[in-house]
Amino acid sequence: MSKLDLNALNELPKVDRILALAETNAELEKLDAEGRVAWALDNLPGEYVLSSSFGIQAAVSLHLVNQIHPDIPVILTDTGYLFPETYRFIDELTDKLKLNLKVYRATESAAWQEARYGKLWEQGVEGIEKYNDINKVEPMNRALKELNAQTWFAGLRREQSGSRANLPVLAIQRGVFKVLPIIDWDNRTIYQYLQKHGLKYHPLWDEGYLSVGDTHTTRKWEPGMAEEETRFFGLKRECGLHEG
């Protein structure tokens, strides 16, 4: 695999960027998750960051990347509407894994947003997208800029939803390299990794949640539901961070 020039790739149209990364992605598909992280650290530019929503299976990517690159900044975009269990899970994992946690929030508080816009998540797809732009996308863009990130690790998996089914290991998003080390893992592999390393699922897993975000746009899974239907009233799967 040849060295990749981020600036040159950013000059290309999106389709051409995908083609330019195709050979590298074919090789990365042959590596295991640890190998993909190691390759990225050896071949892609720093600074390096890892994002996490501290969701159901978050402990996997947090442990995996942090053990290979200790003290990597871990970006959390906090909406102010996470479940109490999520905030406690964040504290628990930060302490257990000695995470270098970097929390970013919207410039307007949750209460101020409600006063100004109403409950955006109740205003259809357009309202949800505006909410996500304010509380997820802008804080993440600010984090990447302030941390001088050029390579961004994330824990997305193809099995999680149709919108993620064709994602490659390596892409460019928001002007930086984005690496998805566990993109091809299934639920069994996740479980085995957690067991092997003495890690836990998010506490709401035991209450029937397959995916956990904000309290007002997350539902328990019920028979007959696809996993993506448990988020954003089934109107969309992504919060905006992993789109574009």
Curated annotation (Swiss-Prot):
Keyword Cytoplasm included in the entry's annotation: yes
Record EC number: 1.8.4.8
Localization per Swiss-Prot or TrEMBL: Cytoplasm
Active-site positions on this chain: 239 (nucleophile)
Keywords carried by this UniProt record: Cytoplasm, Oxidoreductase
Gene: cysH
GO CC annotation, single: cytoplasm
Name by which UniProt lists this protein: Phosphoadenosine 5'-phosphosulfate reductase
UniProt key word Ion transport: no
Reaction equations catalysed: [thioredoxin]-disulfide + sulfite + adenosine 3',5'-bisphosphate + 2 H(+) = [thioredoxin]-dithiol + 3'-phosphoadenylyl sulfate
Gene3D superfamilies: HUPs (3.40.50.620)
CDD domains recorded: PAPS_reductase (cd23945)
Domain of life, per lineage: Bacteria
UniProt GO BP: hydrogen sulfide biosynthetic process; sulfate assimilation, phosphoadenylyl sulfate reduction by phosphoadenylyl-sulfate reductase (thioredoxin)
Organism: Shigella flexneri
GO molecular function: phosphoadenylyl-sulfate reductase (thioredoxin) activity
Xref: InterPro entries: PAPS/APS_Rdtase, PAPS_reduct_dom, PAPS_reductase_CysH, Rossmann-like_a/b/a_fold
Pathway connected to this protein: Sulfur metabolism; hydrogen sulfide biosynthesis; sulfite from sulfate: step 3/3
Family stated for the protein in its record: Belongs to the PAPS reductase family. CysH subfamily.
Protein task: Catalyzes the formation of sulfite from phosphoadenosine 5'-phosphosulfate (PAPS) using thioredoxin as an electron donor.
Pfam families linked: PAPS_reduct (PF01507)
